[in-house]
């Protein structure tokens, strides 16, 4: 018991815990995405047809608004909050201020990460519409329908934000 009261032992235990935590954190690498495709369907929630539709939307938005909506489907966030996991992916993927990231966790929940410009420009009504677009289908397990409806709504939101910025 005296050994546990020693500062040297306490410091050694602290170092071991910090190193172990750091190694554990580093071992969980984010899923990868191909630049300019922005769809990483690791959980297999989306059909090829849906993925192609999403890519078409992104190409159009990138040309018109310099914006994309990246999509990540995962089986788990590895005990991270969806918000933190989405932020990590957004940073790792190099998403910009005009972009959004839709994170879908299979059988669990989703999270939408907004780029700084979107977050500052979109109205509360527009953000509510984005949320409402995905809710029902997503929680009914209709991931294709939920994702496509989110993109349709995002198309309207991007157009409205573009009109507001041109005024």
Regions found by a protein language model. Name each.
Residues 1-167:
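A structural boundary signal for the start of the first folded domain, especially the loop/turn
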């Amino acid at each position: 018991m005296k050994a546990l009261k020693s500062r040297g032992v306490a410091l050694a235990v602290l170092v071991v815990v910090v190193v172990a935590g750091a190694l554990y954190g580093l071992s969980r690498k984010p899923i990868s995405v191909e630049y300019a495709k922005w769809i990483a369907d690791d959980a297999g929630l989306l059909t090829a047809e849906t993925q192609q539709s999403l890519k078409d939307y992104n190409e159009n938005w990138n040309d018109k608004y310099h914006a994309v909506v990246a999509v990540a489907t995962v089986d788990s966030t590895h005990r991270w909050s969806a918000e933190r996991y989405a932020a990590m992916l957004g940073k790792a993927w190099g998403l910009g201020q005009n972009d959004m990231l839709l994170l879908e966790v299979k059988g669990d929940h989703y999270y939408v990460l907004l780029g700084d410009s979107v977050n500052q420009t979109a109205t509360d009504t527009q953000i509510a519409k984005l949320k409402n677009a995905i809710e029902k289908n997503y929680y009914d397990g209709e991931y294709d329908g939920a994702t496509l409806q989110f993109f349709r709504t995002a198309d309207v939101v991007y157009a409205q934000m573009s009109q507001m910025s041109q005024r």
